Regions:
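Alpha-helical transmembrane segments and their immediate juxtamembrane cytosolic regions
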Residues: 1-337
Length: 337
């Protein structure tokens, strides 16, 4: 969502941002108004969750890609982080059925990432920062219990400063660890590009194979293959917290989507949507609260209609957004600091 500081915008990157926000809105609407007749472990449920589950990882990789541009001053990084934290509080207040006022979320993760000097005049500092971001996700392998419980309530409740700090760094919805690893991936894609193409192909092949094997094993054992949360620990892939299989699947999915950037850039209006992705993310949140209050146990047809309408309505809105009011967006505010 945070835009790259480059002077010339790349349409493929903007198109990927546009795709990411469409996927994010889609999965949020689908989760808010799910039809009782379609279970989360059905083929359709896995398809929607799988595509929607790539939204946040794609955004984080794009954030890393953007951060790998020109170095920013400490003052600029703090100002951007402050704006993103304010946007997070606004999102929380617009969706009280999901979050507390100070629940850390994806925008607070972007705020933390904005504070990190991914590019720095000192090569020693730059290498140290990037190496640390690459190593920290190993926590999910070495000590997965540190990530906290796989329950929604346990990851959104903030009762004191200790809860806030813990959720920001490790136990929340989108904690810095291990999500910083996906930001590091974005940095690597921008700084090394074609040089890591072969490594990316190998990683993606491994990811596809491992995910396929886990899917087969889940079907064999009669347990969920993937789930947002898994209080009983049965699901192989969990989003909250982001466990190792999920991180492998997410990075694989993002790398595969990345290869479609040039093709997506040709979609009319999609890059324009990407340039308003943060604004759209914030603006769609009140609709989730409205859906929660007004729609209960919808039919499959109604649910599908709501998902399609409330997802794709943002595409023409962004495409025809007047230039005269483009300054009244979160992206414009970020570009000024």
């Amino acid at each position: 969502m945070p835009t790259a500081p480059a002077t010339v915008r790349r349409h493929d990157i903007d198109a990927l941002r546009g795709l990411a926000v469409l996927l994010m809105v889609m999965v949020h609407v689908a989760a808010t108004a799910p039809p009782p007749s379609i279970g989360s472990t059905s083929a359709l449920g896995y398809l929607v969750a799988g595509l929607g589950g790539l939204a946040a990882p794609l955004f984080v990789v794009l954030a890393g890609w953007g951060a790998a541009g020109k170095p920013r001053s400490w003052r600029s990084r703090c100002a951007r982080a402050g704006l993103l934290l304010a946007a997070q509080v606004l999102v929380n207040l617009c969706a009280p059925h999901l979050y507390g006022p100070f629940t850390p979320g994806v925008l607070s993760l972007f705020a933390l990432l904005a504070l990190i000097p991914w590019t720095h005049p000192s090569q020693a500092v730059q290498r140290g920062v990037r190496a640390t971001a690459a190593i920290l996700p190993a926590v999910v392998l070495v000590a997965p219990a540190l990530q906290g419980p796989s329950t929604w309530d346990g990851r959104v409740l903030v009762e004191n400063p200790q809860d806030l700090l813990g959720h920001l760094l490790l136990t929340g919805l989108y904690p810095f660890v291990p999500w910083c690893g996906l930001a590091w991936l974005g940095v690597m894609v921008r700084t090394h590009g074609a040089a890591i193409r072969q490594a990316g192909i190998v990683w993606s092949l491994c990811g596809v194979v491992v995910c396929g094997l886990l899917l087969f094993r889940a079907a064999e054992q009669g347990v969920p293959w993937a789930a947002p949360t898994s209080p009983n620990g049965q699901a192989f892939l969990t989003f909250f917290p982001a466990n190792a299989p999920f991180l492998l699947a997410a990075s694989t999915g993002v790398l595969l989507l990345w290869t479609t950037g040039a093709w997506l850039a040709r979609a009319p209006g999609l890059p324009a949507l990407g340039r308003l992705s943060l604004t759209v993310y914030v603006a769609h949140t009140p609709l989730l609260w409205l859906l929660h209050r007004t729609v209960e146990a919808p039919s499959a047809i109604l649910s599908a209609g709501l998902v399609i309408a409330l997802t794709f309505v943002w595409w023409p809105i962004a495409a025809f957004w007047p230039e005269s009011v483009r300054t009244w967006t979160f992206e414009a505010a970020l570009s000024k600091v």
